Amino acid sequence: SESQVTKDGEYNKVLNGIPDWVYEEEFSYNRAFDFSADSKMIAYVRFDESQVPMYSFPWYKGMAPEKTEYTTYPGSYDYKYPKAGVVNSKVSVHSFDIKSRVTRKMELPVDSDGYVPRIKFTDDPEKLAIMTLNRHQNRFDLYMANPRSAICKVAIRDEAEQYIKEQA
């Protein structure tokens, strides 16, 4: 059966388990939640994009699908779009116990402008892997979190003078 996990989601303000524009485009991230191996918990990233500036994108008639309402004049599509150097979404990681319906915010020491580009439960349902990057992207941390206690411990840290380069 289905049931609502969060209640604070709001268009152009708070996204739960669905990445914002930066995460979709820059981290190829389209699912910001994961289930534990025993299916008893869900972990998700919360994106507070309330302070991110809006951007207006022109919308034309086009094709596939054709938007006939814009045949004569273009319309616009407004969305949260942080340009370089402006405020990004504030992110936090949460766990939700499906049986008890308790939500916990992970005690993750992520910078206020940092990124959480991935979360993934391990085969052990008591261990949630959380990957973080600072805004400059020259420090990567892999945390192992206990989704029931919300305690996070650094497992790996990688730092570089310029930026962390993804290995192909």
Pin down the residues of each PLM region:
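Surface loop/turn motifs at the tips and blade-to-blade linkers of beta-strand repeat domains
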Residues: 24, 107-112, 156-159
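Loop/turn position at the start of each blade in beta-propeller repeats
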Residues: 28, 88, 111-116, 137, ...
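Beta-propeller blade signature
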Residues: 1, 91-99, 142-151
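Predominantly five- to eight-bladed beta-propeller fold
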Residues: 5-33, 41-99, 103-107
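Local beta-strand/beta-hairpin segments that build beta-sheet-rich folds
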Residues: 2-5, 74, 153-157
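Long hydrophobic segments that form regular secondary structure
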Residues: 97-134
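Beta-strand C-termini and the immediately following turn/loop, strongest in propeller blades
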Residues: 1, 31-34, 43-49, 83-87, ...
